[in-house]
Amino acid sequence: AKNSDVAKKIERGLVGGLFNLKGVAKIRDVQKLAVENSRLGIPLLFGMDVIHGYETIFPIPLGLSCTWDMAAIQESARIAAVEASADGISWTFSPMVDISRDPRWGRVSEGNGEDPFLGGAIAKAMVYGYQGANLDDQLKRNDEILACVKHFALYGAGEAGRDYNTVDMSRNRMFNEYMYPYEAAVEAGVGSVMASFNEIDGVPATANKWLMTDVLRKQWGFNGFVVTDFTGISEMIEHGIGDLQTVSARALNAGIDMDMVSEGFAGTLKKSVMSGKVSMKALDAACRRILAAKYKLGLFDNPYKYCDLDRPTRDIFTKEHRAAARRIAAESFVLLKNGNVKRHPG
């Protein structure tokens, strides 16, 4: 609604993107608000958790991994991108590539299992499906959307399978068993990375400079932008890191570019720059990376690139898409056979 609190923030230039707004007509109206009513006219990103299909639903990621068919997995992401983009979505919070070996963790089904090699292959297939398979030509079409690999890093390795919990492991195990799928997504050109909630070496990932800068950018060469998970910045207050200004400054200095929901960046970074806690160079770099993603998506040339009102009826839940989903679902089936294996009494 044009008179809502969010609309007023958009007009003031305080919003860089929205998530979970569904419907191309609604998205077009909000994009128009940003482009025509804000001072700088910077277009918004519109994101959604498009995890295993949009309207045409594919097997959950754990099920897709059972196909061991990278072409089929890439096809599923491609169809999801076509449908989501037809409804105004330009950014998906996928693929989720967290390796997990503890069945007590509640999000095992969103990942691809225990094997980092398989996870890396699937990460690449999903990114290619969403963004396009040609690294030199990604995101040019209006049916290709920005991917976001998550949750960086080690989100599936929390102690005792408890969500948001601490992660304590050697570098050897970390890089041999858990990190490759994230790196593989970077190799495939993924445009954004989402930080995880857990801590590593006693430092929350959202404020972990070693993770976000030394590994992700310097070691792997990632040049996209990093976004927090939902309220990832403000949740560090409960973890004892500091007040909202302190945790926001630590996140930006660590390499976080976009604050999801916490509003710590919008509310405190000006004070942090003035007090010297954050440099203008660091703030400019974060802004530049987000703007670069919007340029790469073509939103400055055409803010309504993903707002063709005729596309939903043409491209969503089509007969061809449903047939592909049925075929890939059948390929994912795993049958267990009772072979009368001898059991030794324990």
Question: Positions of the model-derived regions?
Answer:
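Glycoside hydrolase catalytic-domain context in secreted enzymes
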Residues: 1-346
